[in-house]
Amino acid sequence: MQIPLLTPQKDPMGAAIADYFANGKASKLRVFSSMFDEDEIPVKQLFRNFTEMPALEQEALRMSEGRILDVGAGSGCHSLALQEMGKTVKAIDISPLSVEVMLKRGVKDACLENFFNEQFSGSFDTILMLMNGSGIVEKIANLPIFFHTLKRLLAPGGCVWM
């Protein structure tokens, strides 16, 4: 399964993140998919700090240990919270606009990367896929490659938080 890196012209989420970061305003991001119902996300929600996150996300961040991979990191809110806790995190996203914003916001290790890229390597004690992180699977037929990729990147005894 090869998910291409996005171009700015085909990156509405990255554009919304960049606009909100630059101007402090963006209304809602509408998400359409044949796999689930239409959804709306207030862009401001992507810029939450730790105390504004739901209890379940807070607990996942607290329980994250060792070398952490934040998949589909978006604006970097989870990575920033982890850094503030003194944890080591690598944030990846297929959106160049999102990665640029993460770096400007202070995420120390943010890179433009496709989770499914066989050349992407590393050994992570925790893999985070919060919010709609499992959406990268796209369809049931992609579950085997998804689990293969998790197994390849997850250190022995590691955990995945979704």
Regions found by a protein language model. Give the residues of each.
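A short glycine-rich, Lys/Arg-flanked "PGG" loop and its adjoining helix->strand segment in the class I
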Residues: 142-156
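A short SAM/SAH-binding and catalytic strip from SAM-dependent methyltransferases
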Residues: 124-144
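Conserved alpha-helix/loop element of class I SAM-dependent methyltransferases that forms part
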Residues: 47-67
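Conserved SAM/SAH-binding loop
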Residues: 75
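Conserved SAM-binding strand-loop segment of SAM-dependent methyltransferases
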Residues: 106-117
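Conserved SAM/SAH-binding beta-strand->alpha-helix loop
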Residues: 95-96
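N-terminal auxiliary segments of SAM/dcSAM-dependent transferases
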Residues: 1-30
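Short alpha-helix immediately C-terminal to the canonical SAM-binding loop
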Residues: 99-100
